[in-house]
């Protein structure tokens, strides 16, 4: 009989739950729930398990917040809980809660050739460190290294580092955002809300009044060519994504590749390919050639967080990925 476990990917907007086949790692019965519709993560899990009519003994859930100890409090959501208490309440033998980008990073070793698109650089070097980051409701970051036959994810909160500027345009943008926000982290620019901040900052720094637009409206207007300011904002977003990725690559010498996840970039992949992303990625002065050799991939798998949560759980049970 097939043995399955519960896996989850919980962000600031949605909670995705699915079943993972422990033998093959395949993901099935995926459902998405709005975080606004439920008082707690436990409530969402109960609804999902009732819908599947299954009793599950093990679960691994990636959540968009730092994981340090038993108490979990989400960064971009009001949910907070005790891991131990939730495990007891759900009657689980094993409940593992990990950072959402720990989960995404653990998907990388099990991605298929059709699950990613390469954007420049050479061949990924086996055994070398890997970086992964992604823009969605927030900005997630992790690194991945291989030790013998095990993969080790290095979680962190890299999305909250200071955002530096490299041009006069970026100087003006960050200065404008600093007046509004105080501390300007990378996440304040490289996320869905960040795209809105870029748009507002560019227009305001030109002494004009910006429209009230959503991230999707900005990207749609940019792609259709109907709004010059939206096009400017999306173009600069791509450049800043490149600068940030180049910093990640330098931090750990990620000759295993830099991977882009998250819900934003796949929506405008062709625009992203043609943007200034790759030039900005390698724009590191004396280390330009160093960066030009490093491959960058956009993850196109629809659910890397679920896939990676399953991989993390399977490896913790002694299964080689």
Curated annotation (Swiss-Prot):
Any one of the GO BP annotations: glycolytic process
Keywords: ATP-binding, Cytoplasm, Glycolysis, Kinase, Nucleotide-binding, Transferase
One Pfam family from the record: Glucokinase
Subcellular localization, as worded in the UniProt entry: Cytoplasm
Coiled coil regions, renumbered to chain: none
Keyword Kinase included in the entry's annotation: yes
Enzyme class: transferase
InterPro entries listed in its UniProt record: ATPase_NBD, Bacterial_glucokinase, Glucokinase
Protein name: Glucokinase
Gene name tied to this protein: glk
């Amino acid at each position: 009989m097939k043995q399955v476990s519960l896996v989850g990917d919980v962000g600031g907007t949605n909670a995705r739950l699915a079943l993972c086949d422990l033998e093959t790692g395949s993901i099935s019965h995926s459902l998405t729930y709005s975080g606004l519709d439920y008082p707690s993560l436990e409530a969402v899990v109960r609804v999902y398990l009732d819908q599947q009519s299954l009793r599950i003994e093990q679960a691994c859930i990636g959540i968009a917040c730092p994981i340090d100890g038993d108490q979990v409090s989400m960064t971009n959501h009001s949910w907070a809980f005790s891991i131990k208490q939730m495990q007891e309440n759900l009657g689980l033998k094993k409940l593992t809660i990990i950072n959402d980008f720990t989960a995404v990073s653990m998907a990388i070793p099990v991605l298929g050739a059709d699950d990613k698109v390469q954007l420049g650089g050479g061949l990924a070097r086996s055994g070398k460190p890997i970086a992964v980051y992604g823009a969605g409701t927030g900005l997630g970051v992790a690194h991945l290294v291989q030790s013998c036959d095990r993969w080790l994810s290095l979680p962190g909160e890299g999305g909250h580092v200071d955002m530096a500027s490299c041009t006069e345009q970026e100087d003006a943008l960050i200065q404008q955002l600093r007046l509004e926000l105080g501390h300007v982290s990378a996440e304040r620019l490289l996320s869905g809300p960040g795209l809105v901040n870029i748009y507002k900052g560019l227009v305001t720094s030109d002494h004009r009044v910006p429209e009230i637009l959503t991230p999707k409206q900005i990207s749609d207007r940019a792609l259709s060519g109907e709004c010059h300011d939206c096009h400017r904002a999306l173009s600069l977003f791509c450049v800043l994504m490149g600068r940030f990725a180049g910093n990640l690559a330098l931090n750990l010498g990620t000759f295993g590749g830099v991977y882009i996840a998250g819900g934003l970039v796949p929506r405008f992949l062709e625009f992203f390919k043609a943007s200034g992303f790759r030039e900005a990625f390698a724009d590191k002065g004396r280390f330009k050639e160093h960066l030009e050799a490093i491959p960058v991939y956009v993850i196109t798998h629809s659910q890397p967080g679920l896939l990676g949560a399953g991989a993390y759980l399977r490896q913790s049970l002694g299964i080689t990925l």
